[in-house]
Amino acid sequence: KTHVYGKWISGGFENSLCAMFGSFGESNKDYISLWKGQEDWCFEYGKSMASYFGPSGNEKLITSIEIDNEPGNDFDDPLYQSIFRSMARGIRAGDPKIKIVTCTAHAHQADKYSKDLRETFSDPQIIELFDVINVHTYAQLEKGLTKSPWTRTYPEGEDTTYLEVIEETIQWRDHHAPGKEIWITEFGYDSCTPRVMANRTGWFEKLDWRGVTDLQQAQYLIRSFLLFSSMKVDRAYLYFFDDKDEPQVHGSSGITRNGKPKPSFHAVSQLYQTLGDYRFSRIVQKNSQLYLFEFLKGKDRDQVCWVAWSPTGFRSDQKVKKNHRATEITLADLPSKPDRLLAMQTSGESEPKDFVSTSGSITFELSESPVYLFFEPKQ
């Protein structure tokens, strides 16, 4: 209450509770028998959670509950559906204001981590029970293409289903469950220090696992948030907030390292503070050399920000990753006179970026780090 939920609430964040199956999951060989005949218990458990933690109660610690995290195709599907129905109905009875979130799911064949929306959540009786479709997506290459099964690439890369997974989910939602929200509750990139990379062990050494650089982690996280903002999703949560500098998948995915900010921490903080009150408006340009998105502050069309970046990058298995690839670019047909240009922040200070502005155009350096171009209000 105080040390976990309270700190996030005081920071202005909402909390989502995940009812993990844990040792009652598929890793327990007797898990099916353990759940047999427990429908009433599932209902009461859901009701108790909602009553205590929910926004209608005294504690007001959470606003949503996810029913297990990643049961995937290893967890018996009819059993999961039964648990979901009972627990969701209990949550509704305990606090109808709580948003009920599915486990991780997507609109194609189930895998080790995600259920198939078309199978697990297509029944109209289940659709009416949930409010949010939960998606995990990583810019990972298909297994077998590289020595490591955990190789990741930049967000716009053509050799990953990173964005395709989300588009498929949106299409399924629009057709079968209109009105339901979509939350991306996991995405991210690992970046550890060279010192620990030299001491990899186990399969991470044998299969030559590699993360991205600290700068690339910042670039790819910000670009991911920007890309997600242009899609019909409601929320996106990065994974993870802190790491212990471990050279393994998910072991160095924090935006802080042992509690100390990485470049990605400053970049995400800047995005939050700079565009937090803005909303995606349109794609101005989108090609192999330039992504240019427009954001408006609320419904005020006079407060405009363009965000520009080069949609290029490196795969994590590439041993040599150049830190700075840039080119000069000129943009025309501007909405008004340029006011300021901010570089992506990677330290404690936000840095203005040089530009040359003439009548109706602006010239500046474009790189893989997004820049924020603000305009003066229209006269």
Which residues make up each language-model segment?
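Aromatic-lined carbohydrate-recognition surfaces of secreted/lumenal glycan-active proteins
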Residues: 61, 84-117, 161-193, 233-245
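C-terminal beta-strand-rich structural cap/linker in extracellular carbohydrate-active enzymes
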Residues: 352-379
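Substrate-binding surface in catalytic domains of secreted glycosidases
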Residues: 128, 132, 137-173, 202-215, ...
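Aromatic/acidic polysaccharide-binding cleft in carbohydrate-active enzymes
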Residues: 188-271, 282-291, 302
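Conserved, mostly hydrophobic/aromatic
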Residues: 49, 65, 87, 133, ...
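Carbohydrate-binding surface patches
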Residues: 286-335, 370
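Substrate-binding cleft and catalytic face of glycoside hydrolase catalytic domains
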Residues: 1-149
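Solvent-exposed beta-hairpin/edge-strand motifs
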Residues: 330-350
